[in-house]
Amino acid sequence: MANGKYAARKLKQDRQQRRWSDSEYARRERGLGAKSDPLEGAPQGRGIVLEKVGIEAKQPNSAIRKCVRVQLIKNGKQVTAFCPGDGAISFIDEHDEVTIAGIGGAKGRAMGDLSGVNYKVEKVNGVSLIELVRGNAEKPVR
């Protein structure tokens, strides 16, 4: 490793080469996060509900979290989205159009005891899921 009086160029060159060993740097520079993102960088996305699924929570919790499999309209990719709220799953039926957004986990990934679920349902047929759960709104008949 160069460390003399005129070694700045060599030091900079070495640093640039070694940065590629850092996986976060390499992913960021290659744009791999955007390539693998089902929403393609958008904050929200619309999709059609394919099925309701119950996903078991990770240890030490013991619960079946109510989720839905959603096929996105923009690119046909399938994702699993969590349905927040007590009894929220009862307001969602197959073939409903839902709006999903990121669930808000660390580094844009899964949250809490739900592994592999990176999204949550925000709207059902254009109506807020929270409003439906509270009873402030009714689901429109399609």
From Swiss-Prot:
Residues 1-44 are annotated as: Disordered. Keywords: Ribonucleoprotein, Ribosomal protein, RNA-binding, rRNA-binding. GO terms for biological process: translation. The keyword Metal-binding does not apply. One of its GO terms (molecular function) is rRNA binding. InterPro entries: NA-bd_OB-fold, Ribosomal_uS12, Ribosomal_uS12_arc, Ribosomal_uS12_euk/arc. Disulfide bonds: none annotated. Residues 11-32 have a biased composition (Basic and acidic residues). One of its GO terms (cellular component) is small ribosomal subunit. It holds the Pfam family Ribosom_S12_S23. The keyword Transit peptide does not apply. Belongs to the universal ribosomal protein uS12 family. With S4 and S5 plays an important role in translational accuracy. Located at the interface of the 30S and 50S subunits. Part of the 30S ribosomal subunit. This is Small ribosomal subunit protein uS12. It comes from Haloquadratum walsbyi (strain DSM 16790 / HBSQ001). The gene is rps12.
